[in-house]
Amino acid sequence: MSNGPPSPLESLEKTLPQASYLDAGEFQREYAAIFESGWVCVGRSDTLTEPGDYLAIRLRDQSLLVVRAENGELGAFYNVCRHRGTELVPLKDPGPVSGQFSRSIVCPYHAWSYHLDGRLRGTPHLAIDADGVSLHTMPLAEWGGFVFVCLAASHDEPLAETLGDGTARLKRYPLADLRVGQTITYEVEANWKVIVENYNECYHCGPIHPELCQIVPAFKQGGGDGLDWDDGVPHREGANTFTASGTTTRAPFPGLSETEKTHHKGELFYPNLMLSLSMDHVAAFYLWPQSAGHTRIQCDFLFHPDELSKTDFDGSDAIEFWDLVNQQDWNICESVQRGMRNKVFEHGYYAPMEDYSLDIRRYVRGRLAEADR
């Protein structure tokens, strides 16, 4: 090692070490401590409106179902028949996939059936007392129309405690009333933390998002330093939303403050929900890590039902603009992931204007420490 003077970079905060982004063993440890030990977001309840509507998704090797029961309640179950372990909804792909059961959930293997609330209904040619037998359940909770499940064997932390103060900052947005207008799924060859770190700072916005910075010049001023995410970031004069023109014919959400009608807000809810909020639409990102170097991202574009019900509704101005911005983000995140494989890379650094990205370092270390207790 060199005995020379310390590098000027040593005055900066360090990222997590290289292995945290690349190593398969570290990924497994981290995934168990975070994604299998607390609340994770799996989608929107407004996509499950009728009895029998379901969402099936595989989170790594854990397969689950979210089902709307006859009484209107949502339930979450492991996607596995009590008989021989068959998937009730086959998932060769991680999903999510959606569909509708008719009167019951029927296993495709031997036709064991279950009520929509998970209770065993029938076992062909077997006289089994169904009372007290049901699909394996898991905790489910909702906030703002978002559905969260928990894979932990025992978990007593309320969802509100996990979500933290961000919910109060978004209290005027009618999130529970919004509906999914369109969904785009991305396969990103980058560690999920690289994506979260990118979301948490705008130091990159000037070089990476020139079109976005035309709408929100504050994103590139001073490297994105001093942005007020609590109250939102102002658009340029005459602009009020994330579209190529910065304008739209869609009305602002009811209930917003005057500031929120002209400012953009962003909120991260660990570990896997990122929200970007304009006055007329919301881009909701769900991150589902597949491996140390691969993350599946679903982006739901949410609009007010009053707008969606119009015969001439067209959300493409927002969706196409967001798709451009997203592709720019995912491309640079993949470049980061490739670059970190170089043997000279030990860790990165956070510039002062990237202080929000420090959250991921604190969060991951905290969750790993909890798991090791």
Where do the language-model regions lie?
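Short clusters of hydrophobic/aromatic residues that line enzyme substrate/ligand-binding pockets
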Residues: V42, L88, L120, L212, ...
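Short, contiguous pre-domain boundary segments
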Residues: M1-S20, A176
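C-terminal catalytic domain of Rieske-type non-heme iron oxygenases
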Residues: F146-F148, A152-R373
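Short Pro/Gly-enriched beta-strand edge/turn motifs at strand-loop
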Residues: S37-T49, L120-H125, G266-P271
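Rieske [2Fe-2S] iron-sulfur-binding domain
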Residues: T47-A153, E157-G164
